[in-house]
Regions:
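Carbohydrate-active catalytic/glycan-binding domains of CAZyme proteins
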Residues: 55-270
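Bacterial Sec-dependent N-terminal signal peptides
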Residues: 23-57
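Methionine residue identity
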Residues: 1, 11-12
Length: 270
């Protein structure tokens, strides 16, 4: 992957040529629980397609009787692993596994405590960070290592957690500023690593080889308005990035929310 170059107007071009290939709408926007369930099924189907799974599965909704927002998934051999959001609660970023995308078991957490340096995380002096903490994780597997990343507005940082045994640990932790909102990270075939993040306007940057931070000078605007395929009146900009590469093409999935409309999944391809 080559990062887009800056144009003379100060705007950035997209990676190769990136354009919307799908706009998927689900659920009644006032029913958050149903939206989560349907998005979970949609993501399962998309990941299954990308990995060459049979198109049909038998399942009964809801798959999980719990709040499982912002899910990210990866398949390793015959096992699927999924991470989710825990916000202010600890331990954080639950890791679940399944053999069939239907029956899920909680097997681990990426971290025990996010930080001890922020008084609000410890409820000191009547402070709290309710609903904040860590959001929208991303889970990946690369060369024998499991990677889980997340970010926190509470601390202003991005976090990577790494382990060779996702169920038993131990986990190695790397953190850096800034807090890269709703990011997805990607190990490309050329050995370079990337982070895509943002809300509405999406950015891409190359990561240091050891994931210790963003490489200086590599941040570019990937999509000026990733919500555009869903219309012009948007109340929630495109976020929740998840990037996959299938048959030489990159597919970027985002969720957006048109005003007076339904939550919408937008897919761009490069």
């Amino acid at each position: 992957m080559n990062l887009p170059k800056q144009s003379g107007t100060g705007m950035m071009q997209s990676v190769v040529s990136i354009y919307p290939v799908a706009v998927l709408i689900w659920g009644k926007y006032s029913n958050r629980e149903m939206n989560i369930r349907r998005f979970f099924l949609l993501l399962c189907n998309l990941v299954g397609y990308a990995l060459g799974l049979p198109a049909q599965q038998t399942a009964v909704n809801p798959l999980i009787y719990a709040d499982v927002p912002d899910m990210s998934m990866v398949r390793v051999d015959d096992t699927y692993y999924m991470s989710s959001t825990t916000m202010h609660m600890v331990p954080g970023v639950p890791i679940m596994k399944s053999k069939d995308l239907v029956n899920w078991e909680l097997v681990s957490y990426a971290y025990d405590r996010l930080t001890d340096d922020v008084p609000a995380m410890n409820l000191d002096d009547g402070q709290n960070t309710y609903g904040r903490g860590s959001w929208a994780s991303c889970i990946r597997y690369h060369k024998g290592m499991y990677y889980v990343s997340t970010f926190a507005q509470t601390t202003g940082k991005t976090y990577f957690f790494m382990t060779r045994d996702i169920e038993k640990g131990p986990w190695k932790r790397v953190e850096f500023a800034p807090s890269c909102h709703d990011h997805t990270f990607f190990f490309d075939e050329d050995g370079r690593n990337y982070l895509i993040y943002g809300n509405g306007k999406l950015f891409i940057a190359e990561l240091e080889a050891d994931l210790s931070g963003l490489k200086t000078g590599t941040e570019r605007v990937l999509l000026e308005n990733a919500s555009a395929p869903a219309g012009g009146d948007i109340m929630l900009g495109a976020e929740g990035s998840q990037l996959f590469k299938v048959d030489g093409r990159y597919y970027l999935f985002n969720i957006t929310w048109p005003r007076n409309g339904m939550r919408t999944v937008v897919v761009h391809r490069a």
